[in-house]
Every structure is written in C-alpha cells, then in structure tokens.
C-alpha cells in the first residue's frame, strides 16, 4: 500500500497480477516511489543514554481503537466482559468509545455509568473530534460519571491539511482552539452542577506526519485555551497514526517535542504507536526514554491495519529490566481466551508472552539445553 495517511490504495489487484512478487515492476519501483522520512534536527539527543526506570501510565484503547478495527465488532455483552478483564489486569485509564459516533458507542458508556460498573479508581476516556455538535453529544453521554478524560483531536499532518481539510496550519489550529474553548465551557458548567473529575486530553492526529514545530504550536495553543496549570495537567497524546520512521526517529520526535513545549511540567506526554512498520513496541520503549509518560495501546496489539502497540509485550518486557509494570497478566491463558472469543481474532502462536508456542522448542539441541537448565535450577 502507498504511504499516505488514510488514503490507502487497494493492493488486491496488484497481488492478483503478481506485481508484488519478486521481480514484478511494482517491487522494482518501490525504492523510487517513496520519500525518505525526514530526520529531526537534534544533534545532542539525550534519550540514547537513558534507561527506563518506572512503568508508564497505561491506557487501554481496546474498546475504541481495537473494536473499530474488527471485522465483526464486539456487542455490548462482549464489551462489558472485556472492560471487566481490563479492570482485573489493573488498567486505570480505559478509552471506552466514541459516544458521539453511534448509538452502539453511546450505549456502552451509558451502561457502564448507569449500572455503576466503573470502579472509583478507574477513569474512563471518551474520544471526540474537535467539532461542536459532537462535543456537546459527548458531554451528554458522560452525565453521571465520576472520573472522565475528554479526549479530543483533529488532524494536523501536512498531507491531511492539504488533501482532506484544505486548510493552512492557522486554520487547523483554529479548529483545535474552538474545540478546547467549548470543552472548557461545558466542563465548567458540569462541575458547577455535579461532583465530577474531568481531565483533558488533546491529540494532534497524525503527529508522526506533522512538522514538529507545528505540533508544538498547536498543543501550546490548546493548553492556553484550557487554562492548563500544574494542578490541572493536560494529556498531550502524540499518535504515530501511521508508523513512518524507524523507532529512533520516533524517539527524536518525542524528545524534540518535549524540549520545545512551553510549560512541559504541566503536560503528561502520551504515546499512541501504531505498528505499520512492525516496530511499535520498540518505538514505544524509545519514546519513553525520550520523555513520554503514558502509553495508549491494546491487548496483543489489536488495531487498524497492522495494529496498535501491544500492551502485553510492552508491559512484560519491563520485568526483564527489574521493573514492575503495574499490570497483572498472571492469568494469561484466561486473558487470551477472552480476547479471542470477544474479538473473534486469534492470538498468533508466536506472539511474545501470550502465544501458545513461546515456551516451545523443537530443536533437539535446544531441548537438551533446556533440560540441563531445569536440572541446574533444581539442584543449585
């Protein structure tokens, strides 16, 4: 497929023609079609000399980003079971849907609230575009919730500005600012009536394809409009909506953004890696080194195209560095069974930690070494 955000050319007919076979004309021209990812101008990068010393804040987007990627989306019963599993694992921030998008998305949120299914220490997150009627619908949907993150976004990449919205950067900033202004107004009105904890999250969608100075600029304007301060921190979510660079390039983007952002101490920097190049876990780990505080991902990496970052792999990798990730995957088989049943998707047998073959060796020499290792541990 062509590397263009959300403008994906169907490739089936190319496969049918055989052009994607080695020697096909399309493959021959591949290196000529693509423009190399532009590196970030940062010569004194600090992240390579750092180590991860603590887990990030975890946010599951299974019920929203993961669910919308399913051929057969989950029904209400399945979503509720999935939500309970996420709570049991220990996820404290859960994006439950896009309530202004459809009645089914609205239904899961209202069910969770009205049946009092959300633990007091869990914050639900709702996604909304920076559009007035959708924002108002979202505030109707969260009525009665105790702890909510309002996650609003608009696209900022060069390509989307030119092709989709036909706006310059000032026009895109205005969309974000208008949305932030309304969200603050509705939040103030709701808090005056009810005891509710509302936090803000803003995503410059397609951050990975946006000029870094423009990404910083739009986030700073949103912070100003929301009156962000140390006691009212904003989550700035930086999506690799389409993964376009190597993981070190992504880390450079995050470090550059963190350095340039005014009042960095008033922001929680969140990552939302996708796996188009197969390196979402590495990009997330290096992004944490570069200054990120929070990760949005899914169980086993379910998500659009090649998936979101896999929270299971990312979390369990931390044990190898002596870090408790704060998530409990001790019931891996039960978690995997729930995932496969509700999503109707299999977990790859080679999937790190959760795959059925990850503790299996077929090589005779490997089996011999494993047996000797077990014997050594038994007798030492």
Predicted regions and their residues:
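N-terminal capping/small domains of soluble enzymes
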Residues: 22-132
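A mid-to-C-terminal "edge-of-domain" accessory segment
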Residues: 27-62, 322-380
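Hydrophobic faces of well-ordered beta-strands that scaffold small-molecule active sites
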Residues: 58-61, 94-96, 120-128, 148-152, ...
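Alpha/beta enzyme core
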Residues: 76-89, 132, 136-201, 205-264, ...
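Alpha-helix-loop-beta-strand connector modules within alpha/beta enzyme cores
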Residues: 105-126, 177-185, 254-269
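Glycine-rich phosphate-binding active-site loops on the catalytic face of alpha/beta enzymes
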Residues: 292-307
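C-terminal helical cap(s) of enzyme catalytic domains, especially alpha/beta-barrels
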Residues: 303-325
